[in-house]
Amino acid sequence: MEIRRRPPNPTVRVENLEYAVPHREAKAKNILEEIVWYKDIEIKNFKKIVSLEDLIKKLDKLPPTKDFGKSILQSKIKPGVIAEIKKASPSKGVIREDFRPNEIAFSYERSGASCISVLTDKRFFQGSYEILQDVRGATNLPLLCKDFIISAYQIYKARVSGADAILLIAAILSDDDLFYLKKIADNLGMSVLVEVHDEQELKRILSFKLFDLIGINNRDLKTFKTDLKTSIEMMSKYSDIFSKHNIIPISESGINNSEELKKLVSIGIKGVLIGERFMRECDIEHSFKKLFKSI
């Protein structure tokens, strides 16, 4: 899937004045492209408040990061669970009205989650880096900053806000971007979960021999519909490669019951990312235990 970056608006000069005119391809083709295009604006606004240089100055005072992959592999629950804190989504709107991130984090940790994923996108998911920072103060579990990362600035902001890991989405990043952003994360001691949505993206990521955490997203990011067959079909072809190269495969989205979890474990999935399934429940701990009681 190809996601374009926002084309710059051309300018027209009339005598001594210049006017920006809409680019003829300045309309996003799908939700993911719309989100990525807005990120450019969001990052510029962030930099007006806190510069990259100011973020870097804060690094020395931070504690060491926690090992995201190790936490998944050592989980008593199989597969290891990346439990997500998410208030809303573009396709479903507000998912959890009574949204108390710290209490949600407590519930996840008590239930046996390996790690916690925190949505930091504000415009489309009603998340924030402030929420990430609050959750960091509420739990000792490794934290994943779940955002649409296109800039090194976001990685520094995630680290300063308490994240131990970041998400990189293969569909929105060039090869050069992936290499560069992975290097930045490595230098900050952060883990990288790289996300793929189809076999073509997976082949591309495997060819780099760079990532040891690969998330197979069962959600079509053009339509935001989910289908567990995405994970099943990719694991049927590539589980041996994952094992050979010590890659930890994570199945993301669309996981709803114990039978699906058993199936994922049987095909070699080591971790699952579950968010909406828990966010819709009043009693998260009860829902968590019910989902994993027979695994």
Swiss-Prot record:
It catalyses: 1-(2-carboxyphenylamino)-1-deoxy-D-ribulose 5-phosphate + H(+) = (1S,2R)-1-C-(indol-3-yl)glycerol 3-phosphate + CO2 + H2O. Pathway: Amino-acid biosynthesis; L-tryptophan biosynthesis; L-tryptophan from chorismate: step 4/5. Pfam families: IGPS (PF00218). Its EC number is 4.1.1.48. GO terms for molecular function: indole-3-glycerol-phosphate synthase activity; phosphoribosylanthranilate isomerase activity. It is an enzyme of class 4 (lyase). InterPro entries: Aldolase_TIM, Indole-3-glycerol_P_synth, Indole-3-glycerol_P_synth_dom, Indole-3-GlycerolPSynthase_CS, RibuloseP-bd_barrel. The keyword Amino-acid biosynthesis applies. GO terms for biological process: L-tryptophan biosynthetic process. The keyword Repressor does not apply. Keywords: Amino-acid biosynthesis, Aromatic amino acid biosynthesis, Decarboxylase, Lyase, Tryptophan biosynthesis. It comes from the Bacteria. NCBIfam families: PRK00278.1-4, PRK00278.2-4. Belongs to the TrpC family. This is Indole-3-glycerol phosphate synthase.
